[in-house]
């Protein structure tokens, strides 16, 4: 169990809702993931026009914490406007601040992200910024007052896993708010690794929705995240450079 602002979460898997082939697979994958939090791009939801398609039409949103994001924003001003659209439509006031600074790599813009977070915090939102694995930026955002830090593992949709585990560990060790690893996770192994490093949770979309069997992958990710967290809490053995027998040698007679 952990908290983001006033929201208490039991599941450490936060699930994105895009890219599923159809609504049936989406619904089954959500169930298999056992998630409590569904995230979505506000621009995809058509919040004010009920005649347009709703990608979550078949999902009972009353059973979940809805977690809108500002995908599509390229400036702080755009991110704030998107967040306010979601809030005025009655969607959860916890917002993932996503401000993209480069169209090719889809890496977040640190300056615009910081400014958007500052404004949204002043307006009373629960703010969770998506950032690169910049340790100093993570600390500055925590000092600003954000409620969680969401560093990428690797660029969005690449499935490359954790490109820089050292920086991710530095972020986890240095901030005192939840760290949700977001973007680049490709397999349950990657998710488990992030959790073993001490992450509080994982936000996933492409790794599940684009898998050959999204429902099975959702289950696998759920178990990988649970295993990684349990391993972190248990404490792994230290890495050594010399062999050490697992059987004791004391008290063994000569043969």
From Swiss-Prot:
A Pfam family of this chain: ThiG
GO BP annotations listed: thiamine diphosphate biosynthetic process
Keywords: Cytoplasm, Plasmid, Schiff base, Thiamine biosynthesis, Transferase
Disulfide bridge positions per record: none
Predominant localisation class: cytoplasm
Active site: 96 (schiff-base intermediate with dxp)
Gene Ontology molecular-function annotations: thiazole synthase activity
Positions annotated to bind 1-deoxy-D-xylulose 5-phosphate: 157, 183-184, 205-206
EC number per UniProt: 2.8.1.10
Compartments, as annotated in UniProt: Cytoplasm
Metabolic or biological pathway, per its Swiss-Prot or TrEMBL entry: Cofactor biosynthesis; thiamine diphosphate biosynthesis
A GO cellular component annotation in the UniProt record: cytoplasm
Reaction it catalyzes: [ThiS sulfur-carrier protein]-C-terminal-Gly-aminoethanethioate + 2-iminoacetate + 1-deoxy-D-xylulose 5-phosphate = [ThiS sulfur-carrier protein]-C-terminal Gly-Gly + 2-[(2R,5Z)-2-carboxy-4-methylthiazol-5(2H)-ylidene]ethyl phosphate + 2 H2O + H(+)
Cross-referenced Gene3D superfamilies: Aldolase class I (3.20.20.70)
CDD domains in the cross-refs: ThiG
Main EC class the enzyme belongs to: transferase
Function comment: Catalyzes the rearrangement of 1-deoxy-D-xylulose 5-phosphate (DXP) to produce the thiazole phosphate moiety of thiamine. Sulfur is provided by the thiocarboxylate moiety of the carrier protein ThiS. In vitro, sulfur can be provided by H(2)S.
Oligomer and partners: Homotetramer. Forms heterodimers with either ThiH or ThiS.
Protein family membership: Belongs to the ThiG family.
PANTHER family, per database record: THIAZOLE SYNTHASE
Protein name, UniProt field: Thiazole synthase
Organism field: Staphylococcus saprophyticus subsp. saprophyticus (strain ATCC 15305 / DSM 20229 / NCIMB 8711 / NCTC 7292 / S-41)
